[in-house]
């Protein structure tokens, strides 16, 4: 089999290089504003991310060896909120966090839409307002 599953595609060198160049520029800007990189797992416990909204719409759901319900992350914000609440709860605020990671989402068939996209973004947590 040589085709990718529908909604997924290979990214060839020219496009991959362009994407990398953009990501390096954005990362540099965010780093200059004090945003620190974080990474979260591709798989998350469904309950830890809440049962509604985008999590309910994720196209890939599975169970681990212990029977726990897992989802492939459809967004990066909720896993970061989970990480902050469980691992960085004593951190000094505001937290400036940045990420660059793939997510998998639902997409209508036969539209050419991608189900896997790379989200490059940031979260400002605990600030009194927009800075």
List each language-model region with its residue ranges.
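TRNA-recognition modules of translation machinery and tRNA-sensing kinases, especially anticodon-binding
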Residues: 1-131
């Amino acid at each position: 089999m040589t085709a990718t599953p529908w909604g997924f595609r290979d990214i060839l060198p020219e496009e991959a290089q362009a994407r990398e160049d953009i990501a390096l520029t954005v990362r540099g800007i965010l780093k200059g504003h004090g945003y620190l990189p974080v990474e979260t797992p591709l798989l998350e416990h469904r309950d830890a991310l809440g049962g509604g909204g985008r999590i309910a719409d994720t196209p890939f759901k599975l169970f681990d060896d212990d029977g726990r319900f897992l989802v492939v992350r459809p967004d990066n914000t909720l896993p970061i909120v989970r990480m902050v609440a469980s691992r960085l709860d004593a951190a000094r605020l505001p937290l400036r966090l940045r990420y660059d990671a793939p997510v998998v989402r639902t997409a209508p068939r036969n539209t050419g839409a991608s189900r896997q996209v790379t989200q490059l973004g940031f979260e400002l947590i605990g600030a009194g307002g927009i800075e």
